[in-house]
């Protein structure tokens, strides 16, 4: 039960083929795992949920997590984890919050063991059973790959322009509007084109919701956005912005979009691109 499965998880394919892994739950599957599932190699079911739906399933017990392995760019000997402060920073650890809360056992996996206490901690010592130190947990430079890269595709750029015109010509486009983009090239490009109209009309974004990329963080840095709330960072500029801008806040995937809580951020969105 992973928040997402991609090329980094290709090594799991032989375990799917030999029946070691029978069922998969995730919010998305790409790479060789996606190909294996598409060709019927998974013996059981592949269940896809939204990010908020995954939180709901775990919190209600529909999905039970026996053991959670949480990659932590920095961690101390007692399990205080952060998405910053190490050599493989990823920004925030939002999708792992529910695993840390609900799993029977929690293992923090880090390549940067720091002095105790590693504060502020996104996942704190009360949730973690074991700390495992490895050579490297990831490659930050490869965060912005595939769909997360800015596009040069003219078709996607045209789509972005059309999206921007729709946004700019609706009654919701006024000072304090709320906005979220996906990570696709057209979505990223739409933020860039929208920023020009915002500047021309002196309209400010009250709330930006992420996954976040450089263009959204630039809106915050330029004063065109007032607050960003963040569940995932899709490039190194967004990763670093968590640390440098005090109006850039980590939130949990449950706060973002769980249908079972009393007030998810998605309920307050004017636009999603």
Locations of the language-model features?
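Conserved alpha/beta enzyme-core scaffold
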Residues: 1-273
